[in-house]
Design a protein with these regions (language model features):
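Metal-dependent amide/peptide-bond hydrolase catalytic core
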Residues: 17, 24, 31-237
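Contiguous, small/hydrophobic- and glycine-enriched helical/loop subdomains that border
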Residues: 1-12
Length: 237
């Protein structure tokens, strides 16, 4: 639409579910891959090889720590919650607090081995990374590259980003990195205020609900909020 048809919208209304409110942004996301090399050998003498799965086990623990740790000096790996602190994110911490902290989780694991009786010579994982305001794909890749276990294994580890190149139903292929940036519209933006004013005029200041169950979940919540998951808004902003 943008590259070929040259359509440049002034604003876009996403029809993703909002739980009866008006959502004005959400975190970005990217898909990271970590590959580890080892040396295969027969399982009867594992000391002759170099088990890639064991190396990856160390990396997995560090990825978990990156997501779960606090941001103080008591830990070697400062957690992603640090981006809510103006000390680490002076220009964007307020937006980060609205959108929520970034997260990472291991979503897939792969390996190669000659058989069930051999030492694995490679192991790889996929990491689902959700990004808050102030984070970039470069900073997220560097966080993984700087993990103690990744540094420990040096050239045996490769950190990269996935690519999308799946053909559409027309056969068209738009190869693109698996990176979709964080986006946020200020509540004071004219198009956001127009939606708020329209909602107030039609239904009042509360979120919409159809029954008591929905009312219990929505009553008293801010009318304007954000999505927790990633919507197609990442390809629009």
């Amino acid at each position: 639409i943008y590259n070929v048809d040259k359509i440049v919208p002034e604003f876009v209304i996403s029809t993703e579910p909002t739980d009866g409110g008006i959502d004005r942004g959400h975190r970005g996301r990217m898909e990271i891959r970590v590959d580890v090399k080892g040396v295969r050998c027969h399982g009867s003498a594992p000391e002759r090889g170099d088990n890639a799965i064991y190396k990856m086990a160390d990396i997995l623990q560090d990825v978990r720590a990156l997501n779960e740790n606090p941001a103080d000096d008591s830990v070697e790996i400062k957690g992603l919650v640090k981006m809510l602190d103006p000390k680490y994110n002076p220009d964007h911490y307020e937006d980060a607090r609205f959108l929520g902290r970034g997260t990472c989780t291991t979503s897939q694991i792969f390996y190669t081995s000659p058989s069930r009786c051999a030492v694995a010579d490679s192991c790889a994982i996929s990491i689902d990374r959700r990004m808050t305001a102030g984070e970039t794909y470069k900073s997220c890749l560097k966080e993984i590259e700087d993990l103690p276990s990744v540094k420990k294994y040096g050239d045996d580890v490769k950190v990269s980003m996935y690519w999308y190149d799946r053909p559409a139903w027309t056969g068209e292929v738009y190869k693109t990195e698996c990176f979709f940036p964080t986006w946020i519209n200020k509540e004071s933006a004219p198009h956001v205020q127009a939606l708020i004013d329209a909602h107030h005029a039609l239904w009042g200041e509360e979120r919409l609900w159809a029954d008591d169950t929905a009312k219990a979940k929505r009553e008293g919540r801010p009318l304007t909020d954000k999505w927790t998951f990633s919507t197609n808004g990442v390809s629009i902003q």
